[in-house]
């Protein structure tokens, strides 16, 4: 089975969140984990298959940055962040299933791999744009998650439509198929609508 013991998940997840946050420059300041595993005297085992960890940070945002703008003809759809790898494929689907229900290889491939240094670089781009005040070119920004560019870039264009030049996406793995470039959830990447 590819299920880790509850205690190992709680310790490693907590260590990972703290390590990532510290490398990124925004330490995790709150959080908790939750699991349950009980073996009854009869030998029957009761427990939660998926352990849960919640973490959080504290931030602020100016009111004018709360509303995202609408796509209009002539705007650019761009991405900033890490290069494309074949990781996080089917991550959205895998997160909706019971852990261990899939094949081990599918479970492994669906897991994203964080890159705190790249996350910090991407965050600096966003922050630099925000600090331009009224000259901020960002109309809308979406974090790339489940579905990869296939999801985030379509969300940005929505009703206005747009042209996506898939072959201009920077690749970390030059052997990726067009399908994997389009759907993989490679990490630390955002899509931007630039006006």
Task: For the regions a language model picked out, list residue spans one by one.
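Glycine/proline-enriched, intrinsically flexible loops and inter-domain linkers
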Residues: 1-195
């Amino acid at each position: 089975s590819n299920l880790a013991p509850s205690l190992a998940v709680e310790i490693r997840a907590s260590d990972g969140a703290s390590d990532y946050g510290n490398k990124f420059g925004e330490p995790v300041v709150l959080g908790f984990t939750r699991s349950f595993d009980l073996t009854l005297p009869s030998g029957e085992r009761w427990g939660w298959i998926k352990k849960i960890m919640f973490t959080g940070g504290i931030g602020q945002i100016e009111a004018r940055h709360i509303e995202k703008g609408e796509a209009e003809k002539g705007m650019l759809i761009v991405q900033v962040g890490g290069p494309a790898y074949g990781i996080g494929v089917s991550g959205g689907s895998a997160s909706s299933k019971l852990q261990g229900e899939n094949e081990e290889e599918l479970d492994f491939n669906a897991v994203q791999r964080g890159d705190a240094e790249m996350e910090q670089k991407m965050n600096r781009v966003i922050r630099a744009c925000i600090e331009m005040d009224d000259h901020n070119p960002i109309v809308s920004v979406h974090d790339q998650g489940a579905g990869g560019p296939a999801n985030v870039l379509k969300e940005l264009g929505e009703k206005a439509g747009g042209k996506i030049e898939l072959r201009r996406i920077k690749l970390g793995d030059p052997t990726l198929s067009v399908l994997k470039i389009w759907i993989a959830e490679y990490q630390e990447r955002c899509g931007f609508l630039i006006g």
